[in-house]
């Protein structure tokens, strides 16, 4: 049986009676909207400077920078969650959060296999690199990460819950890539 998302509950219990600063939607140099200065190490350092206690790395359709994020967060005393901002077949962006790096990587592999073979063109859409904790580039993702995977909102949510994760709709206040902009409503459940 997989570990559940109980790690969040433990963090909140320790923070009872005080304000807990968290950021659950962060992109790194892996996402084409990011740049090379946004390594997991640099992100964790900035989060620590700002007093953030809980953070989730949620690159587009991939978790390949989550291992470096885990190490960087441990160095700074930040409780990490490991995630993905998945793009569904309806073009909704959904945050998928996990307490374990391995589970986020597993979902990332499934998403990548379900994405169309639209290749990234770094000169036009930006780099998509994953790095180690020393900021050495380990590789570059070939497919363009900001495309829809062959997962419906309901199918993705079911899979994330099956893996012991947490599902959060992204961009709830935006006119694009949100549940309401794409579906016209927020589904039950």
Predicted regions and their residues:
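An N-terminally biased module of ancient metal coordination in phosphate/nucleic-acid-related enzymes
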Residues: 7, 12-90, 183-186
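Basic polycationic patches enriched in arginine
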Residues: 1-2, 14
């Amino acid at each position: 049986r997989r570990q559940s998302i109980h790690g969040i509950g433990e963090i909140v219990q320790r923070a009872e009676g005080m304000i807990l600063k968290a950021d659950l939607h962060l992109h790194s140099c892996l996402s084409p909207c990011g740049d090379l200065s946004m390594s997991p190490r640099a992100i964790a350092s900035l989060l620590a400077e700002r007093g953030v206690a809980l953070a989730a790395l949620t690159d587009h359709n991939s978790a390949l920078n989550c291992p470096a994020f885990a190490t960087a967060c441990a160095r700074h005393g930040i409780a990490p969650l490991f995630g993905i901002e998945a793009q569904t077949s309806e073009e909704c962006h959904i945050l998928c959060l996990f307490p374990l790096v391995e589970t986020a990587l597993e979902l990332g592999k499934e998403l990548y296999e379900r994405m169309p073979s639209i290749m990234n063109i770094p000169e036009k859409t930006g780099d998509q690199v994953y790095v180690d904790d020393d900021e050495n580039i380990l590789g570059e993702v070939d497919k363009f990460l900001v495309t829809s995977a062959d997962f419906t909102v309901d199918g993705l949510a079911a899979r994330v819950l099956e893996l012991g994760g947490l599902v959060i709709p992204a961009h709830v206040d935006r006119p694009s890539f949100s549940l309401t902009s794409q579906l016209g409503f927020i589904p039950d459940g």
